[in-house]
Amino acid sequence: AGRQGVPFTTGILVGIGEGWRDRAESLLAIRELHERHGHVQEVIVQNVVPNERSDFAKPDLSTMRRVVAMARAALPPEVSVQVPPNLSPAADLVGCGIDDLGGVSPVTDDYINPAYEWPDLDGLRAVADAGGMPLRERLPTYARYLPDGVRPAGVDPAPAPTGRDAWIPPAVRERIRAGDVHGRRLRGVARGDGPLAVRGD
């Protein structure tokens, strides 16, 4: 993804038999790749959960707190750290360095872990408030990778990827800039005022 200039989300799975050194080496490898290519948007620190495919035990809270803190310390500040709030106690981890709650939906299931429902919006708002994070819809591509005129004010652009003039392909840039209802909606979400925005009273 980095060599191709694609903004990318990656992560580590916690509780599959790895040790502390494995976790640290994985996080440092992600950092090194981002320093080389500038493409890592966020790192998901995901705990394993019991399901029909595995008998791994879910990591305890102290383990998750430590791994999240390791991720925040290892990664550059522009790379977000996230935990899936339907799999981890996000409210107990927000003080350890998470700054994104990931792709959640009040209207769909978690297709990867369907037995684990998304928290409701009020629950997510409480977690976001506890961490001082705004709770709002965002695009899959982080704001720093968006083109001029779409990227929100105050967000510095990521340096252009090697061998390309932009992070977003021309067809996607055209879609975002379109004058129709879909283009307007995408631009609204990019600014943080999309239709599913949840604001405090």
Predicted regions and their residues:
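Short gly/pro-enriched beta-turn/loop segments at secondary-structure junctions
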Residues: 9-11, 38-39
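Canonical radical SAM enzyme core domain
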Residues: 15-22, 88
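Radical SAM/AdoMet-radical enzyme domain recognition
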Residues: 1-10
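A generic short-segment signal for beta-strand/edge and adjacent turn/coil regions
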Residues: 12-15, 72
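Auxiliary Fe-S-binding modules of radical SAM enzymes
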Residues: 24-28, 34-201
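Glycine-rich beta-alpha junction loops
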Residues: 14-17, 47-49
